[in-house]
Regions:
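A membrane-interface helix-boundary motif in multi-pass transporters
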Residues: 160-177
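Helix-to-loop junctions at the C-terminal end of transmembrane segments
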Residues: 64-75
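C-terminal transmembrane helical hairpin of 12-TM major facilitator-type secondary transporters
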Residues: 76-122
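Hydrophobic transmembrane alpha-helices of Major Facilitator Superfamily
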Residues: 25-29, 60, 101, 113-121, ...
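Multi-pass alpha-helical transporter architecture, strongest
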Residues: 125, 175-198
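Extracytoplasmic gate region of multi-pass secondary transporters
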Residues: 8-63, 151-154
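Helical-face signature of the major facilitator-like transporter fold
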Residues: 19-20, 24, 107-113, 144
Length: 198
């Protein structure tokens, strides 16, 4: 792993790790959305679980769309940035605008489509930033480690933030802002031309 911190790779390694961590941190916070719907919106637990399930079903198409767009229309870096920004806008609408169950379903579905869908190209983008002999190490550090830390800390952070600031501000701080910051971090990474991948 120390080779990733040599001068040639350090900046790229840290940017990828930080971007991935922030993204996973925000994603991890959304694991508590059922609790948000039952506490902040006072929904029945069955309705809260249903809307999460339906939205994840919609989100599955986001993975496919991101893969197609990242492979054939845009480069992967730009797909991640676009999907993250669209996902953050939908997240804002989910928390601050949507009121009815149907409105929530639409914007939550859009959030999962874009925000979660970016993961279809993120791992590949991390790997293609490094030569073949470093890809497994880079993917484990800047990818898997960052994801596990984010998934672990995100739910803890939203429970703390919701208790201290309320659910809407909590999700703004712990969910929405980290997605936008991750998108900005990915902007600092150079696009990888397809011919340089292999």
């Amino acid at each position: 792993t120390m080779i990733l911190f040599q001068e040639k790779w350090r900046r790229k390694t840290l940017l990828l790790f930080t971007g991935q961590f922030l993204y996973a941190f925000a994603y991890g916070s959304t694991l508590m959305l059922v609790l948000y719907f039952t506490q902040a919106r006072e929904w029945d637990i069955v309705d809260a679980i249903k809307i999460v399930g339906y939205s994840y079903g919609i989100g599955a198409f986001g993975y496919i769309a991101a893969a197609i767009v990242g492979e054939f229309f845009l480069i992967r870096r730009n797909t991640i940035i676009l999907w993250a920004l669209c996902g953050s806008i939908a997240f804002i609408m989910l928390i601050w605008w949507a009121e009815s169950w149907n409105q929530v379903l639409i914007v939550y579905g859009l959030m999962t489509l874009f925000f979660y869908g970016a993961y279809a190209v993120m791992a590949t983008f991390i790997a293609e930033n490094f030569p073949a002999e470093l890809r497994a190490t880079a993917a484990s550090f800047s990818g898997t480690l960052a994801i596990n830390l984010g998934f672990g800390l995100g739910p803890l952070a939203i429970t703390y933030a919701a208790t201290n600031f309320g659910w809407n501000m909590g999700y703004t701080y712990v969910g929405i802002i980290p997605i936008v910051l991750a998108a900005i971090i990915f902007m600092f990474l150079k696009p990888v031309p397809r011919e340089d991948v292999f």
